[in-house]
Design a protein with these regions (language model features):
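Acetyl-CoA-dependent GNAT
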Residues: 63-68, 163, 167-168, 174-216
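Conserved acetyl-CoA-binding loop of GNAT-fold acetyltransferases
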Residues: 117-123, 265-274
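Conserved donor-binding loop and adjoining core beta-sheet/short helix segment
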Residues: 2-8, 21, 25, 33-95, ...
């Protein structure tokens, strides 16, 4: 028998599941990050955190924040987690809570979607990776630095291009400029320059976790790809973050980009879990 438990606040979710979340920060980072950001807000249909229990033991954690996907965390890593995903789909339908999609391990997402019954598509299949010990490549003489307002004409088009390459909806340049400006204000956007001072790479520190940080928006200018800049830049960024006290650096990578993924592995990143992003098709 499975039982679904929901929480009054994201903070209560964090407290009740702290042991799992502490030991699996990288795998659970989407729910963990959202719960921390909205810790004291009251939960409801548009901000929902819970767990599915089997015989009093959590086998699946879930979180939903409008307008984002439902996120599933596989506590059990067994058939119990798969069955819990099915039970959760039935429960959400009974509560008339409609989600735009689901993120999590492929086996969980597919079990959920089969019960949900609507048409869906796989937007991207990813691996969650983590680096705890850096293997620095031989330096090429480039330099990593924080982006400054004067970089907007270079970096804003890159942000728009990254969105398109990653399969997201097209991002108008003006919106890309806004994203650039916010990241510069927060001090989260980094650029890598060649020895000649030419920017060729960018990455964003996008999620601050209790013991580490997550990097996203990794982009190398097309004309500079295949020359080792990404590998060196990522090594420098990880070195900087871990030098500031982080125990690890996390990253989601596209399964269909093995060249980049090998570059990450060469500097010490390891795959910890698969993560798929499924979207429900509108009108189904």
């Amino acid at each position: 028998f499975m039982n679904i438990v929901t929480y009054a606040t994201p903070g209560a979710f964090l407290a009740d599941n702290q042991a799992y979340l502490r030991d699996h920060e990288v795998e659970a980072q989407l729910n963990l990050g959202n719960a921390v950001a909205h810790r004291e807000e009251p939960c409801g249909p548009e901000l929902l955190f819970g767990k599915v229990e089997e015989q009093g033991r959590a086998v699946l954690l879930f979180g939903y924040l409008v307008p984002w996907n439902l996120c599933l965390d596989d506590v059990a890593h067994s058939d119990s987690g798969v069955q819990a995903a099915r039970e959760l789909a039935l429960w959400l339908k009974a509560q008339e809570i409609v989600v735009p999609g689901v993120n999590g391990r492929q086996v969980l997402c597919e079990a959920f979607l089969q019960v949900w019954g609507s048409a869906y598509e796989l937007r991207i299949a990813m691996d969650a990776m983590v680096l705890r010990r850096l293997h620095a490549p031989l330096p090429k003489g480039g330099a990593l630095r924080l982006a400054v307002p004067e970089d907007e004409e270079v970096a804003a088009p890159w942000i728009a291009a990254f969105q398109q390459e990653a399969g997201h909806r097209e991002l108008p340049l003006e919106m890309a400029r806004e994203k650039f400006q916010k990241r510069v204000e927060k001090g989260t956007l980094y650029l890598f320059e060649t020895r000649a001072g030419t920017p060729v790479f960018m990455a964003t520190v996008s999620r601050f976790l209790p013991h580490g940080k997550c990097i996203s928006g990794v982009y190398t200018e097309p004309g500079s790809r295949g020359q080792g800049y990404c590998q060196e830049a990522m090594a420098l960024l990880c070195q900087r973050l871990m030098g500031q006290g982080d125990e690890y650096v996390a990253l989601f990578v596209d399964k269909t980009n093995p060249v980049s993924n090998r570059a990450y592995q060469k500097i010490g990143f390891e795959i910890v879990e698969d993560n798929c992003d499924y979207r429900l098709k509108e009108g189904t």
